[in-house]
């Protein structure tokens, strides 16, 4: 994906009637990585001395995951006050306007019912299963669009990098929560089963109905934001211990050394807001037949299909 495609996408989202969608400070990691990624330089150096282990270590060392939001990239660690100021649009809901939208929303609400029934207020364990599922769509969609680009021998329109960044980000969420809790054997088996089923179902769904697939992920992320908001409420109420944040989370989100689990929840929720907005926008692009992200879309072209509401997300 070309570097130029992403600023255009960010600007196109800002020009829509959705001011909460992808603010100028929440660009994908594929864009953020450009100024800091020295891979090209290192590759040239390795090519000159391919057998030097030191050169290979320098090259490999550059490939650390980067966060998807610009708030988490910088030289100054982020404190709790800064995390709380990140606008996530908690409670904002995309109103379904088509059969495809209603189908996606119905599936998500169906899954939410069983998640609530099984996990109740065990939010850390819920997060482990949630992030296992959430890491699948970006990888599946990115893989299918990658293969399509190769087969048709044409540019992908800028989707692949965004989708793979999403998958990587969700994977880091999972690894973080695995550090916080120790899932039981049953939960690990459940994760393996759910991931296997969801991968195959989503793979088929994306091949046949990509618009519905992206809309479904958008609604999944809406539910994720609600869950993480309830998670915060339980921590504030003293029902969930607010222990120290894992070192993995501190490094990934550039948090302060004394960061807590609550800070991690705030950071993860901000990421989920980004994924919500991106996937709803991807679905919109398919609806209006303007899938090339290198080309801007106007607010007028999206106005007929963008309907928003605010839902009550008070903890149960």
UniProtKB/Swiss-Prot annotation:
Entry GO terms, CC: mitochondrial inner membrane; mitochondrion
Entry membrane topology: Multi-pass membrane protein
Gene3D superfamilies: Alternative oxidase
Membrane-spanning residues: 124-144, 189-209
E.C. number: 1.10.3.11
Annotated transit peptide: 1-26
CDD domains: AOX
Subcellular location field: Mitochondrion inner membrane
InterPro entries per record: AOX, AOX_sf
Pfam families the record matches: AOX (PF01786)
Cofactor note (record): Binds 2 iron ions per subunit.
Cofactor: Fe cation
Binding site for Fe cation 2: 170, 221, 272, 275
Purpose: Alternative oxidase which function may be to reoxidize reducing equivalents produced by glycolysis such as ubiquinol.
Recorded family membership: Belongs to the alternative oxidase family.
Protein name (record): Ubiquinol oxidase, mitochondrial
Organism annotation: Batrachochytrium dendrobatidis (strain JAM81 / FGSC 10211)
């Amino acid at each position: 994906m070309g570097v130029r495609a992403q600023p255009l996408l960010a600007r196109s989202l800002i020009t829509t009637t959705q001011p909460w969608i992808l603010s100028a400070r929440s660009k994908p990691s594929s864009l953020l990585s450009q100024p800091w990624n020295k891979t090209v330089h290192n590759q040239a150096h390795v090519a000159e001395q391919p057998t030097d282990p030191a050169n290979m270590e320098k090259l490999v060392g550059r490939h650390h995951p980067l966060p998807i939001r610009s708030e988490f990239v910088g030289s100054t660690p982020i404190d709790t006050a800064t995390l709380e100021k990140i606008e996530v649009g908690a409670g904002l809901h995309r109103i379904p306007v088509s059969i495809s939208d209603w189908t996606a929303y119905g599936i998500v609400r169906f899954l939410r019912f069983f998640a609530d029934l099984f996990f109740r207020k065990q939010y850390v364990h819920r997060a482990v299963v949630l992030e296992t599922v959430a890491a699948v769509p970006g990888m599946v969609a990115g893989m299918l669009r990658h293969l399509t680009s190769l087969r048709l021998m044409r540019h992908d329109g800028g989707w692949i990098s965004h989708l793979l960044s999403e998958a990587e980000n969700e994977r880091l969420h999972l690894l973080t929560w695995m550090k916080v809790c120790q899932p039981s054997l049953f939960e690990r088996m459940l994760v393996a089963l759910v991931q296997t089923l969801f991968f195959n179902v989503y793979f088929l769904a994306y091949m046949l109905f990509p618009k519905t697939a992206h809309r479904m992920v958008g609604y999944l992320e809406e539910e994720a934001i609600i869950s993480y908001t309830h998670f915060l409420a339980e921590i504030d109420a003293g029902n969930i211990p607010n222990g120290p944040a894992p070192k993995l989370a501190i490094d990934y989100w550039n948090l302060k050394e004394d960061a807590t689990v609550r800070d991690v929840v705030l950071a993860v929720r901000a990421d989920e807001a980004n994924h919500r907005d991106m996937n709803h926008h991807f679905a919109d692009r398919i609806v209006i037949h303007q899938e090339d992200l290198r080309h801007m879309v106007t607010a007028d072209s999206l106005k007929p299909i963008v309907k928003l509401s605010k839902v009550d997300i008070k903890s149960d």
